UniProtKB/Swiss-Prot annotation:
Any GO MF annotation of the entry: DNA-binding transcription factor activity, RNA polymerase II-specific
Entry's family note: Belongs to the engrailed homeobox family.
Domain of life: Eukaryota
Native species: Myxine glutinosa (Atlantic hagfish)
Subcellular location: Nucleus
One Pfam family matching this protein: Homeodomain
InterPro entries registered for this protein in UniProt: Engrailed_Homeobox_TFs (IPR050720), HD (IPR001356), HD_metazoa (IPR020479), Homeobox_CS (IPR017970), Homeodomain-like_sf (IPR009057)
GO BP terms, alphabetized: neuron differentiation
Residues in the DNA-binding region annotation: 1-41
Name of the protein: Homeobox protein engrailed-like B
Keywords assigned by UniProt, alphabetized: Developmental protein, DNA-binding, Homeobox, Nucleus
Assigned GO CC terms: nucleus
Length: 60
């Protein structure tokens, strides 16, 4: 639960992480960098999909 809150907090601050920030976050949360990277990728994709559904008139 704490890991998820921390990830959400980081995502709120910035949707993209630098390599150094990803490494620090991975160490802090005891996850590997790939897990952090994938979580951010999935979160961005989910957000993009949700925004697309809310605006059906947007050009794709």
């Amino acid at each position: 639960v704490e890991q998820l809150q921390r990830l959400k907090s980081e995502f709120g601050a910035s949707r993209y992480l630098t390599e150094a920030r990803r490494q620090a976050l991975a160490q802090e949360l005891r996850l590997n960098e790939a897990q952090i990277k994938i979580w951010f990728q999935n979160k961005r994709a989910k957000l993009k999909k949700a925004n697309g559904l809310r605006n059906p008139l947007a050009l794709h």
